[in-house]
Structure formats: structure tokens, C-alpha cells
Design a protein with these regions (language model features):
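Bacterial N-terminal signal peptides that target proteins for export
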Residues: 1-13
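Bacterial N-terminal signal peptides
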Residues: 10-22
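An alpha-helical repeat/solenoid feature that recognizes helix-turn-helix modules
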Residues: 27-40, 54-88, 99-196, 204-325, ...
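Structural recognition of the beta-strand scaffold that forms the well-ordered cores
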Residues: 75, 110-112, 141, 149-151, ...
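Solvent-exposed loop/turn segments at secondary-structure junctions
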Residues: 80-83, 101-104, 116-119, 146-148, ...
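Short alpha-beta junction capping motif
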Residues: 167-169, 407-448, 616-658
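Aromatic-Pro/Gly-enriched surface loop or interdomain linker
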Residues: 350-407, 411-414, 504, 511-616, ...
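An acidic, glycine-rich "communication" segment
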Residues: 444-531, 542, 549-550, 562-565, ...
């Protein structure tokens, strides 16, 4: 695409935040910076719209009609969230459809805008958009030359013979292919020959020495002919191959043979890998690499990088995080033309999409079904009408990057060669709230045997068990009549590992929606289960991006005692439920940061008969198992008689454990009574200490939001003996809730309120009211 100045009164730019000034690290850019820039860019686009709905146009390369600024602006506004029924969109659509276009770029952007419009319009307007879409697609398809490429104007309309000598270039061609792909996603049928001709052209023109592409025009000595490949054309060429290979050769490695994948087409994979290697070696966000003029079409280059990153799942090209570095570069740049502004907006907006699945790269056969998660993600995008992406990660990545997606997907066709450090990393991932989906690719028997040993080694506390039809991953949001056979590791709070001993990924790779849609729906159910419907983070958001809670606005005041000791009780049953998530470490750190109260917590597990001078005995469990020997029950009663305090919690808000606690209280001769909202445990007002007021304004996790309407206070049950409060029982989850991790159907508090309730319990122990 040739250079073009956008004739506006002043400089089109979005101001960079002060923190992003020159010299600041690339990862200083935040999602807040990105969303602010996108909104400002949207305002600039709207401000430059003419009264008739169009944008200022230019004509290039002998085109009879406008070049496509209006089409490009319309598509960009639709993509970044401008409502399709707004006046600006309505006027822009009318202006676009009121004029003809014979310019390939304009026609391509028109098709993409119409495809986007028809997704969102009401029935009558949608029908109009679809008819116009069909007409434009027919023109663009007819404009392809026999060699597979496109010129600035449709080749037949330009007077060229529909033969291999007609002029073309790969910039026009990649735009046409992108537009036709968008149309195909909107349900418009594109002749297979269109993709075949284009793919053949790209394979013919790829530089076999380094995997790159140039402009492709044999008569352009600077950018085409035999000149070296450069950034924007290589990224666009690679994105085009992803499109054509997905359409022409779906299901690389599928269907499965006995325990092994089908032989993939090695040539196409090698071509794609060569181009990806070029991207790794040459990526820079600040220039169009290897171009004669590196400043030329730099934002076009970054837009193409985003397309490759999203299609390939690569978060990094070499050592470069393409979105982080690209976003900082874009936000540091003045956008002087309408195309620059649109490319910048599309890069920023599309690249920040939340990540649904991370696919693990490891030493071994990890990618025999190369497009499995890519195709599943595409299905979910359509089903949810929301933009998502997927990524490839390795175990050398920081834990924060592994947690960028709710699911870590591991598929292996040979036993992975995990080091001891790798195994510890995977255990740390699940212990910090992560969820793993492991597949024995094609049901490989060697991987099946290896996995059983591996699971016992890394997660020895739990046994693999088949998931029954009532498991949440089979019910929500889709109630699956047909289900894959899945095993799981469940810790009493959540299933943190899902194991498919038979192949599920070939259905995704082959896009077998018609015959095996239940597997695609299970992919939606799975991330829903892992997140409990919590919103996913945008690309540059981190776990600590949330604004500080007003819950902690009032500082904690400690009473006369500044140290509390706590021990977790061991009993016959799941006494260690939730321990691996280290809630006590978080609670200890919170108190250290915000008060002078020191918590010494021993979670190794003590039987009641071994309790001595601990201030608090913590009794946690999930399910209905709570069996304590007569010796330990008497020891617990004696401990409480000496002034100890019992903190009982139904992990996950388990109703069955709540019943077991009531049976234990009956056996021990204790009385259970609800704690009144005026009690210090809820008001946070102790004799000398001050905690948090959880008698009002308390927020709950999803499973309790409706049932607690009108009851926005913490719920604690007092454990009494002879009228004295000797402990509390929480029927709702506190400890797991305060970690901030997610568990499907968890009956607990939002993070801040869970922490506040826990703090109040400890403050009560450190500063109890005087006995009457």
C-alpha cells in the first residue's frame, strides 16, 4: 500500500502516559493505557467523520473511485465496539453503500465491515448487509488473476487478461484473502479454487532461504522482484498461509491411527515454521524490519504481526513479547493518517483479547495437532460473540504468564521429558489456582502408562477418578448428553486436573462441529468450570491490576496481644482441604503489611491430643467426613476448657460438612447459635482492637449472590459451652476465598470480605471481651 497523508487540521495522536516516557521498560504499558488510547482513537475517528457519513478519501493507482478510508474507518469502529445502531455507524454504512468502488483495498475493507455489521444488526438490516456482502464478495472473487493474486483494481476490470502475466502484488492479495476469510466466517461460500490459487502463489514466492516474502510485484525493483523479504509482507504472507492451510488442509495429524497421529503435510509445516523463524530473528516494534525504508508502513507491519500472533498462538517472537512491545511502540507514535490510526486501533484492541487456553510446548511430541486449540478458540469466539485468543507457553515462562489463561492444555504423543523443575512448576501452577487439561494424543498407550505414574508423583495426595455425568464441566453452560470419558484430580474444592486418556483434539483440529459438537461445547464448559464465570483478564492485565478495595480503607488496630498461634487439626477425613493454596501465608502477610499482629500458623496437622498452648485450633473439611476418636474429642474439649479457640470452616461452603460439624457439636455437648450482627466478630469493634465491619456491605461469590440478596453480612455460627463462646463455625468458605483463586460453585466470600472475616476472627482471639 502506498504512503498516504490524511488531510486533517492537526496531528492525529494519542498522548502517552507519563509512565511510558522514553526509557521506561516495555512492560510498563498497562491495559488501562491501552483502553484509554483506543477510546481516544475512537473519538478522533468520530470527530473526523463528515456530515454525509464518509471520511476524507484519496484515490490511488488509477482507481476510478475512492480508496477505502470510509470502509476502513467503519470496520475499525465496529471492531472496537461502536454500536452498530449508532448514528455514526448508520451514516457511514449508508455512505459506503451509496458509492461504487473498484479498488481492491476499499473492496476488501468493505467486505470486512459488512461481515462485521451482519453479526450485530437486526433482521431487516442484517439481510440488507448480507446481500451487499454477497455482491462485494462476487466482485472480489472475480478480480483474482489466474496466478492467484490481486492488483489494485480487479484484474479483469482493469483490462488485464485473466492469466499469469497480469500485474499483482502480495499486499493487495493478502488484503483480499483476509476479506474473503472474514466473509467465509460470516457464512459466505468462497470457491475452493480461490484459496488454492492464492496458496500456490504464496508458496511459489516465499524465499526458501529464510522463509520471508517481499512485495511480490516482479516489476518493483525496490520491494518486489528479487529484493529481500521484509516485515510487513512476511507477516502478511504468514497470516495468509494460516488462513489457506486451515481452509484447505484442516486437521493436521488427524484422524488418529492406532495410538498415533496421521502423517501431517510436512512441507506446509516447514514453510510456516520458516516464516515464524524469520519473525523471531527480525522482530522489532519500532520499524518495518528489512524494509528499504524501515519507517514505511510500520503500523501496517504491527497490524500484520498481531494477525500472526493471534493465528499462531505465539506470545513471543524470539525474546520479544510482540503485544507488550508493540503496544508501547504504538502508544509512543503519532498517528498522522487515517490508515495509521485504524491499524493502531485494531492492533491495540484485538491484541488485548483475553487468553482462553495456554498450550504447553515441551521436549517431546507436543504439537501433532497444530490447530486444535486455535479451532476450539474460533468456535468459542463465535458461540460467545466475544474476542478471545490462545497462546503457546513453555515451563520456563514466569508463573504469571502460565496463569494468563485459565486452562493449561498439555497434549502428548510420546511421554514428555519433564525435568524435576518442570514437575515442581506444574505442581506450583495448580497450587496457585491453575487448571490443567492433559490429553494422551490419539490415546497413545505409552503416554497413558506414563501419565498415571506422573500424576501420582506430582499430586500424591489425590487419586485419578472418572468424572460422573453430574460434574460441573458436563453441565454448565451446556448440559451434555454425550460426554468424553474424562478422569480428574479433585482436592475437595475443585477439579484442578482433567485427563483425557482418549483423543479429543482431533475433533477440534478437523472442525468436526457437525458430528462432535459436544467436544467443542465441553471446551466452553471447561473454561467456565475453571473460572466459575469470573471475567478473564485482558492481555496486559495482571492479577494485582484491580483497584484497592474500600473494604480496607480503615486501618487495623491491634489490641493488647500482638501474636496469635494457630494449628490445623488432623482427623479422619479430608482435614488438609485447601492447604496447598497457602491461605494462611496470605493471611499472615496481610496482617504483617497492615497491622502489628503476628500470626504463627502451623498447617502440618496436629491431632487434638497434641494441642498445647496454641491460641486457635483450625478444623477444616469438605464433604461429609468428620470422624474424631473419643480420645481426640475429649482432648479437644479439654483444650477449649483451657481457653483455646476453635475455628471450624466448611471448605467451599460444603453443606455436607456443615451437617458433620453439627453432629460433632452434638457429640461434644456444644451449642451452636448464629452470631448476631451486633457482635464484635461482625462489627470489628473489640475492647481495644479494631477490625472490619462485615455486618454490612459484604459481597459473595457467584453461588451465593442470589441467596444472600438482602443479607449482605458475614455469616458465622458461634460454638458455645455453658454459655461461653469457645469457637466459631463458618458455613461459608473463608480461607480458599481469600486467596482469590476460583472454584466452580464455591459458596464463599469475595476476596476482600473473606480476608476481612478472617482478620476479625484473629482479632477476637487476640482481644476477646471480658467475661461477665
Amino acid at each position: 500500500m502506498a504512503r498516504a497523508k490524511w488531510p486533517v487540521a492537526g496531528l492525529v495522536a494519542v498522548a502517552m502516559a507519563a509512565t511510558l516516557a522514553a526509557g521506561v521498560r516495555a512492560w510498563a504499558v498497562t491495559d488501562e493505557d491501552v483502553t484509554r488510547a483506543v477510546d481516544e482513537g475512537r473519538q478522533v475517528l468520530l470527530a473526523q467523520q463528515s456530515q454525509d457519513g464518509s471520511w476524507t478519501e484519496e484515490k490511488y493507482h488509477g482507481a476510478l473511485f475512492a480508496c477505502g478510508h470510509t470502509e476502513m474507518a467503519l470496520y475499525t469502529l465496529l471492531y472496537i465496539g461502536e454500536h452498530p445502531n449508532s448514528e455514526a455507524i448508520r451514516k457511514a454504512t449508508d455512505a459506503m453503500l451509496a458509492r461504487p468502488t473498484d479498488y481492491t483495498y476499499a473492496l476488501s475493507w468493505r467486505i470486512m465491515a459488512l461481515a462485521k455489521l451482519q453479526e450485530k444488526l437486526t433482521e431487516g438490516l442484517r439481510d440488507r448487509a448480507r446481500e451487499e456482502l454477497k455482491k462485494s464478495v462476487a466482485v472480489l472473487v472475480g478480480g483474482q488473476g489466474a496466478h492467484g493474486g490481486w492488483d489494485y483494481r480487479p484484474i479483469r476490470a482493469s483490462g488485464y487478461p485473466a492469466a499469469t502475466q497480469a500485474r499483482f502484488d502480495l499486499s493487495n492479495t493478502q488484503m483480499a484473502i483476509l476479506a474473503l476469510w472474514e466473509a467465509s466466517q460470516a457464512g459466505i461460500e468462497i470457491p475452493t479454487s480461490v484459496w488454492q490459487r492464492a496458496q500456490t502463489l504464496y508458496l511459489r514466492l516465499q524465499h526458501t532461504d529464510d522463509g520471508s516474502w517481499n512485495y511480490g510485484d516482479p516489476n518493483n525493483m525496490d520491494h518486489g522482484a528479487n529484493s529481500p523479504g521484509y516485515g510487513s509482507m512476511t507477516a502478511a504472507g504468514l497470516a495468509t498461509l494460516f488462513i489457506t492451510s486451515d481452509l484447505l488442509e484442516p486437521g493436521s495429524g488427524c484422524p488418529c491411527g492406532p495410538g498415533r497421529s496421521a502423517k501431517a503435510r510436512g512441507d506446509m509445516n516447514r514453510r510456516i515454521d520458516a516464516a515464524l523463524k524469520w519473525m523471531e530473528v527480525n522482530f522489532t516494534p519500532d520499524a518495518n524490519p528489512q524494509c528499504i525504508d524501515p519507517t514505511w508502513m510500520r503500523l501496517y507491519w504491527l497490524y500484520s504481526v498481531e494477525r500472526v500472533g493471534m493465528a499462531s498462538g505465539y506470545q513471543y517472537f524470539g525474546a520479544h513479547n510482540w503485544y507488550q512491545e508493540g503496544a508501547q511502540s504504538v502508544l509512543s507514535t503519532s498517528w498522522r493518517t487515517l490508515p495509521d490510526l485504524c491499524f493502531a486501533m485494531l492492533f491495540l484492541y484485538k491484541g488485548r483479547a483475553p487468553v482462553l487456553y495456554n498450550k504447553l510446548q515441551f521436549k517431546g511430541e507436543w504439537n501433532n495437532h497444530r490447530r486444535d486449540i486455535a479451532n476450539l478458540t474460533s468456535y468459542i469466539i463465535k458461540a460467545k460473540e466475544q474476542l478471545f485468543q490462545w497462546q503457546i507457553v513453555g515451563l520456563l515462562a514466569p508463573m504469571e504468564e502460565l496463569h494468563a489463561a485459565p486452562i493449561l492444555y498439555i497434549t502428548a504423543e510420546t511421554p514428555p521429558e519433564f525435568s524435576e523443575a518442570d514437575k515442581k512448576k506444574l505442581r506450583e501452577f495448580t497450587d496457585t489456582g491453575g487448571t490443567i487439561l492433559f490429553e494422551a494424543s490419539c490415546g497413545n498407550p505409552a503416554v497413558r502408562a506414563w501419565f498415571k505414574t506422573f500424576a501420582k508423583e506430582v499430586w500424591p495426595e489425590w487419586a485419578l477418578k472418572p468424572l460422573g455425568p453430574e460434574h460441573g464441566s458436563f453441565l454448565d453452560p451446556y448440559r451434555l448428553r454425550q460426554r468424553p470419558e474424562i478422569f480428574g484430580l479433585d482436592d475437595g474444592l475443585r477439579t484442578f486436573l482433567f485427563y483425557a486418556m482418549d483423543d479429543v483434539s482431533c475433533a477440534w483440529s478437523l472442525k468436526s462441529v457437525a458430528s462432535r459438537e459436544y467436544l467443542f461445547r465441553w471446551g466452553i464448559n471447561l473454561y467456565t468450570y475453571a473460572t466459575d464465570y469470573s471475567p478473564l483478564r485482558a492481555k496486559l492485565e495482571t492479577a494485582d491490576s484491580a483497584k484497592p478495595s474500600e473494604r480496607y480503607a480503615t486501618p487495623i488496630q491491634v489490641g493488647s496481644r500482638q501474636r496469635v498461634t494457630l494449628a490445623r487439626l488432623k482427623y479422619d477425613g479430608p482435614w488438609a482441604t485447601g492447604r496447598q493454596y497457602q491461605p494462611m501465608e496470605r493471611l499472615t502477610q496481610f496482617l504483617r503489611d497492615r497491622s502489628f499482629l503476628t500470626l504463627d500458623a502451623d498447617e502440618a496437622g496436629l491431632e487434638a491430643k497434641d494441642l498445647k498452648k496454641e491460641d486457635v485450633a483450625l478444623l477444616v473439611g469438605g464433604g461429609g467426613e468428620l470422624t474424631m476418636s473419643a480420645e481426640n474429642l475429649e482432648a479437644l474439649k479439654a483444650y477449649l476448657g483451657r481457653g483455646g479457640f476453635l475455628w471450624v470452616e466448611s471448605a467451599g461452603g460444603s453443606a455436607d460438612f456443615d451437617k458433620a460439624v453439627r453432629k460433632l457439636a452434638e457429640d461434644a455437648g456444644w451449642e451452636l447459635k448464629p452470631i448476631d450482627k451486633t457482635h464484635a466478630l461482625l462489627t470489628g469493634q473489640f475492647p481495644t482492637a479494631v477490625g472490619y465491619n462485615v455486618a454490612t456491605g459484604v459481597e459473595f461469590r457467584r453461588a451465593l449472590r442470589v441467596v444472600r440478596l438482602g443479607r449482605a453480612y458475614a455469616e458465622l455460627v458461634g460454638i458455645y459451652h455453658n454459655g461461653k463462646l469457645i469457637g466459631i463455625h463458618s458455613p461459608f468458605d473463608i480461607l480458599f476465598s481469600l486467596t482469590g483463586y476460583e472454584a466452580y460453585g464455591l459458596r464463599g466470600y469475595k476476596v476482600e470480605d473473606a480476608m476481612a472475616v478472617a482478620v476479625n476472627i484473629l482479632l477476637y482471639v487476640s482481644d476477646p471481651p471480658a467475661l461477665p
